[in-house]
């Protein structure tokens, strides 16, 4: 199945000059969504994953069905102030400024093998920050899985120390 056929391109969103890849059209097609999830699960099945992590927000949509299919737990990584209780934070640089991600301090046990799943790999900044949070808590990132990779943004280079897989490349 060619998953590119299920991605809608929206010109000039969220601002002029951006060619937005809308994954909601894939999510609403049951066969395409199942194929995407099954493809990621196939990539992960021999990696002894203990836990799947998904960054806010579309990482939740891709990560939870993958975790379910693998029979492991799912942990969200969120923007600041969205998680109750004690959190670990990681601040990272953006093109203009900084951003922060948070995870519960008790989300990962030392030595757990973690797969990070998200919808899109762009510059790699968010995924690198997610990996740093996992490692800060003692987890091992065994794979990073994406529905889409925007190759021209070179995010894979920033993640060269990790196993990276994407189903669709632009």
UniProtKB/Swiss-Prot annotation:
It is an enzyme of class 2 (transferase). SUPFAM superfamilies: PRTase-like (SSF53271). InterPro entries: Ade_phspho_trans, PRibTrfase_dom, PRTase-like, UPRTase/APRTase. Gene3D superfamilies: 3.40.50.2020. One of its GO terms (molecular function) is adenine phosphoribosyltransferase activity. Pathway: Purine metabolism; AMP biosynthesis via salvage pathway; AMP from adenine: step 1/1. Catalyzes a salvage reaction resulting in the formation of AMP, that is energically less costly than de novo synthesis. Homodimer. This is Adenine phosphoribosyltransferase. It comes from Clostridioides difficile (strain 630). The lineage of its organism: Bacteria, Bacillati, Bacillota, Clostridia, Peptostreptococcales.
């Amino acid at each position: 199945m060619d998953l590119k056929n299920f991605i809608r391109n929206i010109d000039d969103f969220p601002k002029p000059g951006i060619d937005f890849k809308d994954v909601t059209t894939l999510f609403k097609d049951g066969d395409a969504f199942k194929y995407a999830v099954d493809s990621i699960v196939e990539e992960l099945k021999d990696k002894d994953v203990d836990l799947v992590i998904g960054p806010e927000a579309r990482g939740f949509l891709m990560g939870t069905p993958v975790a379910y299919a693998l029979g492991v737990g799912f942990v969200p990584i969120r923007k600041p102030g969205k998680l109750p209780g004690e959190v670990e934070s990681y601040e990272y640089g953006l093109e203009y400024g900084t951003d922060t991600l948070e995870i519960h301090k008790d989300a990962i046990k030392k030595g757990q093998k973690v797969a990070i799943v998200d919808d899109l790999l762009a510059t790699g900044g968010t995924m690198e920050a997610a990996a740093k949070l996992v490692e800060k808590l003692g987890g091992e990132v065994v794979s990073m899985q994406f529905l889409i990779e925007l190759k021209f943004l070179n995010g894979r280079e920033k993640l060269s120390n990790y196993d990276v897989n994407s189903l669709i490349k632009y």
